[in-house]
Swiss-Prot record:
Subcellular location(s) of the protein: Cell inner membrane
Subunit and interaction comment: Interacts with MmpL5.
Species, as recorded: Mycobacterium tuberculosis (strain ATCC 25618 / H37Rv)
Name this polypeptide is given: Siderophore export accessory protein MmpS5
Xref: InterPro entries: MmpS (IPR008693), MmpS_C (IPR038468)
Induction (UniProt): Repressed by MmpR5. Repressed by iron. Regulation is IdeR-independent.
Gene Ontology terms: cellular component: extracellular region; plasma membrane
Tagged with keyword Cell inner membrane: yes
Keyword Cell membrane among record annotations: yes
Pfam families (UniProt xref): Mycobact_memb
Amino acid sequence: MIGTLKRAWIPLLILVVVAIAGFTVQRIRTFFGSEGILVTPKVFADDPEPFDPKVVEYEVSGSGSYVNINYLDLDAKPQRIDGAALPWSLTLKTTAPSAAPNILAQGDGTSITCRITVDGEVKDERTATGVDALTYCFVKSA
């Protein structure tokens, strides 16, 4: 009998500890976890109205005949246009609360200008000169 107790006391102790831990967890859940899971409704009555649409316009002009353009659309996805005729412009609209438009342009002339306007207001305008001039415009938040 004592020989079996010497070998079985560790598994018995583990069994008692697991039983006490299970009972403790069950008791704690009756106090703190008895309300169930909260479900967030899909349609909110107090949703704010959409923002007024923002109109973002990219413009590139210069002394050359064509331009290579890289810009971010309003979803911040990079777009590329090779060999666009000058002058070039693009108008985008969004109802997002903010946008971060930017554009990079390189032409075959000696002068190039980029401009970003938001709702008719010029936010950034830059001009570069030199062989195959390159310029960029960047608006941190529109």
